[in-house]
Structures are given as structure tokens and as C-alpha cells.
């Protein structure tokens, strides 16, 4: 059998296809949908500029769930949380969870934010456009933070809360923490133009 005839059908978690549509052209270059069995690159991107753009988007979500706090450094736990959340997303929507995640990132990525500029000891806040890489970082951070905050002191498991957060963000629903944060950031930027 030749290598040309051998087609590998690699799916994330052994279930989900990575052939999804990215509507936002500015984010297309920075959302990596590279098919991998196990989303764990081991930080090989760390020393390259824009290296994290080549890290699979599912692994970047896993890394955000692993942020400081109770789950710091527990990648296997974060892996299982995302895996179960994807199953819940599929059961609730009937769609590919990776497609739902990409739609949630597109909807919850802020386009404009505020930065501080200092002129002669006086601080001015100026609205600036957000780079595509930072837009994805902020969207993933807000999705993970919203899920963690909502699952704290809540009988629902974090997998279910994460699935609800991703679905709400994909539907552009304002009950999602990520959508609320995006609207708040853009409102502050609009007022400081």
C-alpha cells in the first residue's frame, strides 16, 4: 500500500472532525484546526513568535481551563472536562462541538478595547483595535472564566456549565459571560474614542 492511498482520518478525542467553517476572515489564520488525536503539544510553540497560532484551538481551551486556581497544572483534568463538555454540546445541539466552539470564539472576541496613554503626567484612555491573536486569547479566557465562576458553589458539574457557556456564546446570547464581557469592553472603548 502506498502512502498516497493511505488516508488517516484523525479526529479530536477520536470523535470530532476538524473540518469546520471559520466565518471571520481576520481570525482564520490564528485558529488552528490541525487534526490531532491528543491535544497536547507540550509547549513546543513557546519560543517562537506567534507560535501559539499553530496550537490546536481545543488545546488552547484546555490550557485556559488550567489557569491559576484549583486546577492549575492539572492538564488531564482539564482534558476530561473539555472532552465531556464536547459530548454535552453534541447532545444538546446535534452539531460538531468544534464548530460550535469556533462560532463561540468568533462571537465573543472583542474588536476594540481601551489602552492607557500618558501625556505630561495625565493619563488618557484611548480606544484601539484588538489584534486577531489577542481577540482569540480574550475570547477563550472569558469562556473559561465564565464557566469556572458559574460552576463554583453550584451543584452542576463544570463540564455542563462549560458546555452551556460555549453554546450561549455560539448563539450570541447575552447570558454568556464571554458575550457580556465583550459588550462591556466594546462599550468602554466606544465611550473613550
Curated annotation (Swiss-Prot):
Gene3D superfamilies: Ribosomal protein S7 domain (1.10.455.10)
Keyword S-adenosyl-L-methionine applies: no
Domain of life: Archaea
CDD domains, alphabetized: uS7_Eukaryote
Annotated Gene Ontology cellular component terms: cytosolic small ribosomal subunit; ribosome
GO biological process, one term: ribosomal small subunit assembly
GO molecular function, one term: rRNA binding
Family annotation (InterPro entries): Ribosomal_uS7 (IPR000235), Ribosomal_uS7_arc (IPR026018), Ribosomal_uS7_CS (IPR020606), Ribosomal_uS7_dom (IPR023798), Ribosomal_uS7_dom_sf (IPR036823), Ribosomal_uS7_euk/arc (IPR005716)
UniProt keyword list: Ribonucleoprotein, Ribosomal protein, RNA-binding, rRNA-binding
Keyword check for Ribosomal protein: yes
Effect of residue 131 to A: In strain: MT-4
Protein family (similarity comment): Belongs to the universal ribosomal protein uS7 family.
NCBIfam families: PRK04027.1, uS7_euk_arch
Functional description taken from the UniProt entry: One of the primary rRNA binding proteins, it binds directly to 16S rRNA where it nucleates assembly of the head domain of the 30S subunit. Is located at the subunit interface close to the decoding center.
Complex and partners: Part of the 30S ribosomal subunit.
Protein's UniProt name: Small ribosomal subunit protein uS7
Organism of this sequence: Saccharolobus solfataricus (strain ATCC 35092 / DSM 1617 / JCM 11322 / P2) (Sulfolobus solfataricus)
Chain's gene name: rps7
Amino acid at each position: 500500500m502506498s502512502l498516497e492511498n493511505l488516508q488517516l482520518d484523525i479526529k479530536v478525542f477520536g470523535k470530532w472532525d476538524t473540518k469546520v467553517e471559520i466565518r471571520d476572515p481576520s481570525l482564520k489564520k490564528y485558529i488552528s484546526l490541525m487534526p490531532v488525536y491528543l491535544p497536547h503539544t507540550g509547549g513546543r510553540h513557546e519560543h517562537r513568535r506567534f507560535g501559539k497560532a499553530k496550537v490546536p484551538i481545543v488545546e488552547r481551551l484546555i490550557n485556559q481551563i488550567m489557569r491559576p486556581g484549583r486546577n492549575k497544572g492539572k492538564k488531564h483534568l482539564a482534558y476530561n472536562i473539555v472532552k465531556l463538555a464536547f459530548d454535552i454540546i453534541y447532545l444538546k445541539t446535534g452539531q460538531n462541538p468544534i464548530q460550535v466552539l469556533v462560532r463561540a470564539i468568533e462571537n465573543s472576541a472583542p474588536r476594540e478595547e481601551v489602552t492607557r496613554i500618558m501625556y505630561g503626567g495625565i493619563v488618557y484612555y484611548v480606544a484601539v483595535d484588538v489584534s486577531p491573536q489577542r481577540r482569540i486569547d480574550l475570547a477563550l479566557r472569558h469562556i473559561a472564566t465564565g464557566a469556572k465562576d458559574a460552576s463554583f458553589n453550584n451543584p452542576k458539574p463544570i463540564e455542563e456549565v462549560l458546555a452551556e457557556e460555549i453554546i450561549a456564546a455560539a448563539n450570541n446570547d447575552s447570558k454568556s459571560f464571554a458575550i457580556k464581557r465583550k459588550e462591556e469592553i466594546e462599550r468602554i472603548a466606544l465611550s473613550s474614542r
